[in-house]
């Protein structure tokens, strides 16, 4: 029985101090991130990452540490309540009165209680040497109480350190991380060596260099040269790699959320309550079957075709078998099947309207809440596009223009618009389709030409020349 109580107390104490030690290590990581903050801002001198990327990367790393700190502190406080309920004096007296000094397992257990995980995972020889010291310290109850108090004071200092780091972090975030004037001032100070005159913008920063007096290749070379002179190339490469990894991961994660999250929410709503509610409402409160004139026309044409096929089947069967069949009963049966089919089709049209509204609403919410991630995605797409060769850029532009506004594109637009109207439950109207087909590609072509003239021609004139050459 005493051994079971001892095992329970040992588990509580190990978890108690282990949680606090983990929170202490995470607070050290936060302090390290704060110390490296200015070096991360220097990465923007190469203009390969936007300010949103740097700020969100630092914020995400700090939030990870905060999550583990809060989790370990929560477990620490829960176990502390249990220990206070039992009584620290009772636990200390129990351990001092029931520890067998000659038992190596118990000695190692006591050492594990009052040691960090890293210290306990050392070699067996080091554990044996510590064990000898521990035996000397446990000769009397007085020495044991002294050791217990010593480790208690040590971990209380660690707890005070963690609380101080958390309080300091709030002030640091408001003054440094989220203070964009200070952030841009630091960026501009690092860029004075490279003759940058335009201040960096938090909301409009791009993944490539802004147009200025000095060519971009020269500023990039000077930035790398300064890094080599200062001897910070290794740390610069590590930080650059971390930012690039975070940049790509956040962009892909945001694209996946924009694609799959609206679809997942609509499917959950549809399967949980939406489909059953619409079916019950339509079948009980509505007397009609068709929701638009197009459904009636299609149903009538289908019924006429079925009637003609039944007449043909009946004529063939009477000639072969010589027995007349009831044509009216067969037509009535097929009519009921058509009514059930178009009744379900009407339910699906209404269901599509609700699910499309939910999907669009979810997408808008994601775009509003993820403005910073959208800016990172924008800079990542631009970085990927501008890292391609001029020939590949021109090829992609030509492929997009030929698919959307090329010679054969009107037929594709007509099919797409017909499918959209049918999905929304509208009847086919050739005048509306012709109007949309004749106007929408023209608007898209105008926007593309404006983008080439206003933006692409300034960023890379060689792309425009290659584009016109391939287009001709």
UniProtKB/Swiss-Prot annotation:
Pfam families registered for this protein in UniProt: CemA
Annotated compartments: Plastid, Chloroplast inner membrane
Keywords, comma-separated and alphabetical: Antiport, Chloroplast, Hydrogen ion transport, Ion transport, Membrane, Plastid, Plastid inner membrane, Potassium, Potassium transport, Transmembrane, Transmembrane helix, Transport
One Gene Ontology biological process: potassium ion transport
UniProt catalytic activity: K(+)(in) + H(+)(out) = K(+)(out) + H(+)(in)
Gene Ontology CC: chloroplast inner membrane
Keyword Transport applies: yes
A GO molecular function held by the record: antiporter activity
UniProt-listed InterPro entries: CemA
Signal peptide location: none
Transmembrane segments: 249-269, 349-369, 395-415, 432-452
Superkingdom, taxonomy of origin: Eukaryota
Membrane topology designation: Multi-pass membrane protein
Family indicated by similarity: Belongs to the CemA family.
Functional note: Contributes to K(+)/H(+) antiport activity by supporting proton efflux to control proton extrusion and homeostasis in chloroplasts in a light-dependent manner to modulate photosynthesis. Prevents excessive induction of non-photochemical quenching (NPQ) under continuous-light conditions. Indirectly promotes efficient inorganic carbon uptake into chloroplasts.
Name of the protein described by the UniProt record: Potassium/proton antiporter CemA
Species per Swiss-Prot/TrEMBL record: Chaetosphaeridium globosum
């Amino acid at each position: 029985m005493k051994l079971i109580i001892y095992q329970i107390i040992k588990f509580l104490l190990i978890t108690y101090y282990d949680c606090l030690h983990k929170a202490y290590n995470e607070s050290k990581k936060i302090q390290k991130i704060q110390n490296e903050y200015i070096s991360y801002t220097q990465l923007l001198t190469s203009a390969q990452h936007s300010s949103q990327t740097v700020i969100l990367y630092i914020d995400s790393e700090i939030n990870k540490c905060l999550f583990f700190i809060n989790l370990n502190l929560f477990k620490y406080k829960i176990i502390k309540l249990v220990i206070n309920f039992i009584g620290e004096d009772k636990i200390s007296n129990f351990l001092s009165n029931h520890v067998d000094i000659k038992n190596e397992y118990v000695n190692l257990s006591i050492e594990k209680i009052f040691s960090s995980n890293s210290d306990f995972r050392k070699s067996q020889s080091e554990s044996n040497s510590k064990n000898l010291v521990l035996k000397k310290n446990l000769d009397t109850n007085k020495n044991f109480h002294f050791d217990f108090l010593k480790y208690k004071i040590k971990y209380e200092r660690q707890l005070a350190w963690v609380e101080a780091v958390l309080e300091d972090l709030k002030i640091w975030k408001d003054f440094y991380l989220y203070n964009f004037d200070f952030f841009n001032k630091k960026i501009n100070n690092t860029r004075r060596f490279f003759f940058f005159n335009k201040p960096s913008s938090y909301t409009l920063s791009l993944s490539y260099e802004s147009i200025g007096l000095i060519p971009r290749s020269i500023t990039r070379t000077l930035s790398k040269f300064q890094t080599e002179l200062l001897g910070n190339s290794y740390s610069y490469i590590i930080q650059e790699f971390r930012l690039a990894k975070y940049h790509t991961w956040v962009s892909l994660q945001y694209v996946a959320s924009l694609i799959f999250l609206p679809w997942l929410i609509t499917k959950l709503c549809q399967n949980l309550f939406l489909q059953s509610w619409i079916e019950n409402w339509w079948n009980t409160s509505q007397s009609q079957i068709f929701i638009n004139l197009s459904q009636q026309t299609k149903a009538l044409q289908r019924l006429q075709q079925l009637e003609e096929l039944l007449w043909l089947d009946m004529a063939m069967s009477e000639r072969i078998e010589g027995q007349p069949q009831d044509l009216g009963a067969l037509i009535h049966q097929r009519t009921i099947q058509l009514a059930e089919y178009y009744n379900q089709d009407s339910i699906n049209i209404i269901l599509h309207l609700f699910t499309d509204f939910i999907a669009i609403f979810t997408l808008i919410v994601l775009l509003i809440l993820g403005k910073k991630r959208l800016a990172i995605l924008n800079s990542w797409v631009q970085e990927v596009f501008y890292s391609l060769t001029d020939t590949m850029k021109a090829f992609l532009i030509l492929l997009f223009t030929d698919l959307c506004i090329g010679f054969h594109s009107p037929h594709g637009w007509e099919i797409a618009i017909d499918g959209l109207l049918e999905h929304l439950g509208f009847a086919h109207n050739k005048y509306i389709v012709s109007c949309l087909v004749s106007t929408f590609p023209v608007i898209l072509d105008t926007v593309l030409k404006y983008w080439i003239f206003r933006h692409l021609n300034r960023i890379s004139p060689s792309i425009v020349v290659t584009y016109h050459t391939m287009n001709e």
